[in-house]
């Protein structure tokens, strides 16, 4: 059991350098810092509460006057112009300075009951809250000034600006910035100055008591925790209802009930501020905290509305055409499911900004505008002329139809003058459409460049254009239009020519005239000649290759025959010379055994095709000897070995002793080099070798 207890103890004991011990020590350190911060915050909160109660008791000693609570009800604020403001006996500065010193890690401002009192109306307040407020807040009625309704508006604005991302506040600030010349930041600063001046005048004795009190200095929590907590606290702030980055200009509306302007303070608030802030460290701290808070928490919308830029001026002047959001485009709950995508531009709409920028660079005198361009919400008229195929076709078709009608009219009038009768009033109003029905479709005729006949097309013509066409169509203008049409579309045939006029009523032009038979024959002949020449050329090439192959084979046969005959003759001569001292019997046997006869099949096995065709019974040539050469072998029946006379041991020894000093080159001469191609004319390796390219004979 001892070993088990030791093992358990080892498991529980921490090794000094292990990862577990490091992580646990880090956790302990982290817990220490967080616990210390929470303790410090608790102590600070208690000390601030104690200090606030002491200051409040001191103020009661200084002032023995009766205080009353004056609350604002929503009914009185709407109907009456004069509103009583409650006095804040130094609570604003004290609460702000102490709350800034006692901020916890989350950095969320702690609003006491006295702060809620000045914002929430009496009718909307709960009973418990009012009782708690009555305990801690007593106000002087004798010193309460009388202010108009706009001062109430300023306080409401202050309460709204406590949340910088409020959509109602942003809307209100934008409206006020467009109505009045002053920016909302300037009005806010002015209101703060008046407020501070009043409070400084009233809180002189409190500030003297505060000078004696020592300010508690505490190291603030780390910045990472502040940033994280601030991010988490601002996570669920509702987004604005409208696009905040676009300032829309709203013209001032004349209301029936005119609101009087805020009266300026008789005494300068800046002078009061200078007098009081010379020897007041508490107010300096309050001001520093106010300025720091205002710079950090100042709204993006306030900053943008106070400092107008060139891009905002351009957006206001343009009227904000393309970026229109519906009321439900940005959801207040923050869910992306209800977001509506922006309306994209139509495909045919041009980029107007690019065209306006390039207007001075590419300026053309003769501008051709599009007649059938879609006039959507996002499309504007382009200052740069653009050639569109459809519009060009329509314009050319219309103009051609007008010219055709004019020619018809002039021709008809000339025929009438010839006959002597009065001409009928024929006008080109046949093409025109009534002004009441501009959507009617009219058939125009234009001449196709491929075929000679006229083809009807449909084109919509506006009534205003038809009036101009009917009134201002003169021969001079028609000529000018014809010239411009020829420049624009040179492929279109000229209608004024007699050939085109004839082809209008000529029925056979609808049919395609076939070329004559002779031309077809010539074409066919050329094609066939081409084909035949190709076939003939290939046949000739094949025949030429065959002939060359046969020639090569015949040359090889001749060379082989020469080589075999030369070798046979050479062998015979050498044998005769070497075997001169031998007996005739021995020489005859050697000749029989070693002679290479050319009358058998093996001599011509590589040159002659000895295959027999089935069914082809042809008499064999008598000259060819198909018999194989005789090879003398020992009979199997004989037990002893029969050897030639020169092969017997005593005779052989004599011959070897005699021939040991003989040089073979003196007898045989120089030995020629051995070529395998000469011995084997068609080996298998020759097939794998690349063929030599034979030059073509021209």
From Swiss-Prot:
Positions where Phosphoserine occurs in the chain: 268, 489
Keyword terms: Centromere, Chromosome, Chromosome partition, Cytoplasm, Cytoskeleton, Kinetochore, Nucleus, Phosphoprotein
Main location: nucleus
Molecular function as annotated in GO: protein kinase activator activity
Subcellular location: Nucleus; Cytoplasm, Cytoskeleton, Spindle; Chromosome, Centromere, Kinetochore
Residue span of region Disordered: 365-390, 405-444, 455-474, 535-560
Top-level taxon: Eukaryota
GO biological process: activation of protein kinase activity; attachment of meiotic spindle microtubules to kinetochore; chromosome segregation; positive regulation of mitotic cell cycle spindle assembly checkpoint; regulation of cytokinesis; septin cytoskeleton organization; sister chromatid biorientation
Biased composition (Basic and acidic residues): 550-560
GO cellular component terms attached to this protein's record: chromosome passenger complex; cytoplasm; kinetochore; kinetochore microtubule; mitotic spindle; nucleus; spindle microtubule; spindle midzone
UniProt biased composition (Polar residues): 422-439, 459-474
Entry's family note: Belongs to the INCENP family.
Function of the protein: Component of the chromosomal passenger complex (CPC), a complex that acts as a key regulator of mitosis. Stimulates IPL1 kinase activity and facilitates its association with the mitotic spindle. Has a role in attaching the kinetochores to the microtubules and ensuring that sister kinetochores connect to opposite poles.
Subunit structure as annotated in this protein's UniProt entry: Component of the CPC complex at least composed of IPL1, BIR1 and SLI15.
Note: Present with 319 molecules/cell in log phase SD medium.
Name of the featured protein: Inner centromere protein SLI15
């Amino acid at each position: 059991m001892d070993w088990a207890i030791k093992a358990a103890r080892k498991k529980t004991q921490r090794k000094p350098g292990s990862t577990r011990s490091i992580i646990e020590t880090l956790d302990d350190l982290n817990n220490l810092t967080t616990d210390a911060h929470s303790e410090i915050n608790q102590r600070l909160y208690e000390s601030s509460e104690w200090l606030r109660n002491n200051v409040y008791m001191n103020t009661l000693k200084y002032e023995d006057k009766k205080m009353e609570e004056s609350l604002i009800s929503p009914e009185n604020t709407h109907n009456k112009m004069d509103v009583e403001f409650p006095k804040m006996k130094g609570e604003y500065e004290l609460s702000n300075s102490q709350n800034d010193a006692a901020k916890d890690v989350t950095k969320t401002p702690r609003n006491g009951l006295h702060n809620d009192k000045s914002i929430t109306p009496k009718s909307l307040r709960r009973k418990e809250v009012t009782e708690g407020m009555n305990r801690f807040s007593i106000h002087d009625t004798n010193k309460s000034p009388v202010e108009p309704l706009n001062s109430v508006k300023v306080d409401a604005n202050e309460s709204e600006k406590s949340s910088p991302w409020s959509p109602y506040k942003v809307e209100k600030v934008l409206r006020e910035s467009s109505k009045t010349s002053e920016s909302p930041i300037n009005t806010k600063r002015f209101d703060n100055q008046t407020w501070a001046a009043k409070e400084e005048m009233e809180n002189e004795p409190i500030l003297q008591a505060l000078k004696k009190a020592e300010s508690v200095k505490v190291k603030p929590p780390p910045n990472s925790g502040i940033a994280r907590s601030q991010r988490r606290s601002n996570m669920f702030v509702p987004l604005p209802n409208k696009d905040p980055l676009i300032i829309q200009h709203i013209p001032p509306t004349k209301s029936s009930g005119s609101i009087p302007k805020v009266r300026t303070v008789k005494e300068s608030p800046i002078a009061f501020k200078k007098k009081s802030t010379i020897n007041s460290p508490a107010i300096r701290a309050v001001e520093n905290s106010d300025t720091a808070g205002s710079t950090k928490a100042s709204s993006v919308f306030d900053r943008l509305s106070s400092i107008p830029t060139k891009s905002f001026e351009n957006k206001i002047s343009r009227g904000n055409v393309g970026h229109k959001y519906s009321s439900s485009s940005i959801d207040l709950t923050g869910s992306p499911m209800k977001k509506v995508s922006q309306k994209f531009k139509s495909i045919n709409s041009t980029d107007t900004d690019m065209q306006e920028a390039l207007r001075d660079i590419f300026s053309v005198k003769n501008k051709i505008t599009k007649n059938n361009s879609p006039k959507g919400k996002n499309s504007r008229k382009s200052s740069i002329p653009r050639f569109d195929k459809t519009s060009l076709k329509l314009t050319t078709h219309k103009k051609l139809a007008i010219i055709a009608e004019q020619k018809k009219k002039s021709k008809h009038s000339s025929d009438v003058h010839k006959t002597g009768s009065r001409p009928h009033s024929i006008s080109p109003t046949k093409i025109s459409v009534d002004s009441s029905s501009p959507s009617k479709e009219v058939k125009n005729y234009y001449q196709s460049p491929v075929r000679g006949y006229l083809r009807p097309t449909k084109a919509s013509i506006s009534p205003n254009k038809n009036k101009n066409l009917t009134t201002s169509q003169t021969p001079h203008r028609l000529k000018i239009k014809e010239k411009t049409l020829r420049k624009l579309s040179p492929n279109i045939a000229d209608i004024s020519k007699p050939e085109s006029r004839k082809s209008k009523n000529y029925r056979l032009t609808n049919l395609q005239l076939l070329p004559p038979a002779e031309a077809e024959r010539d074409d066919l002949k050329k094609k066939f000649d081409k084909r035949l020449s190709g076939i003939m050329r290939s046949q000739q090439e094949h025949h030429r290759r065959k002939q060359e192959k046969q020639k090569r084979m015949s040359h090889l046969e001749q060379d082989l025959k020469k080589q075999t005959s030369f070798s046979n003759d050479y062998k015979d001569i050498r044998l005769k010379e070497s075997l001169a001292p031998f007996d005739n019997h021995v020489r005859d046997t050697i000749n029989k055994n070693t002679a290479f006869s050319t009358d058998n099949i093996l001599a011509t096995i590589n040159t002659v095709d000895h295959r027999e065709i089935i069914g082809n019974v042809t008499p064999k040539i008598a000259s060819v000897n198909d018999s194989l050469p005789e090879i003398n072998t020992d009979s199997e029946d004989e037990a002893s070995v029969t050897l030639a006379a020169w092969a017997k041991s005593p005779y052989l020894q004599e011959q070897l002793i005699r021939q040991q000093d003989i040089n073979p080159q003196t007898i045989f001469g120089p030995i020629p080099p051995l070529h395998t191609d000469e011995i084997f004319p068609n080996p298998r390796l020759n097939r794998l070798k690349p063929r030599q390219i034979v030059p073509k004979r021209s």
